[in-house]
Amino acid sequence: MAERPLDVIHRSLDKDVLVILKKGFEFRGRLIGYDIHLNVVLADAEMIQDGEVVKRYGKIVIRGDNVLAISPTEE
């Protein structure tokens, strides 16, 4: 049976992910929550620009309609 997108996201819970937003922003952090609208909650979040950390956050919520992609990071 084919994998569904939410299955991949669910397996990424409590793991580091990269979230790419429509306007080109990128955030990396530990995925601690999500919903069917792809609203995501990241802990230890960092804003990434040109491969470099430009700002560190604690816990953030990213609204799903801004999300272009969510990618599990390499372990």
UniProtKB/Swiss-Prot annotation:
Ribonucleoprotein in keyword set: yes
GO cellular component terms given for this protein: ribonucleoprotein complex; Sm-like protein family complex
Top-level taxon: Archaea
One Pfam family from the record: LSM
GO MF, any single term: RNA binding
Keywords from the named record: Ribonucleoprotein
InterPro entries per the UniProt record, alphabetical: Lsm6/sSmF, LSM_dom_sf, Sm, Sm_dom_euk/arc, snRNP_Sm-like_arc
Domain Sm: 4-75
Keyword Ribonucleoprotein: yes
Biological process according to GO: mRNA splicing, via spliceosome
Family: Belongs to the snRNP Sm proteins family.
PANTHER family noted in UniProt: SMALL NUCLEAR RIBONUCLEOPROTEIN F, SMALL NUCLEAR RIBONUCLEOPROTEIN F SNRNP-F
Protein name: Putative snRNP Sm-like protein
The species this protein was found in: Pyrococcus abyssi (strain GE5 / Orsay)
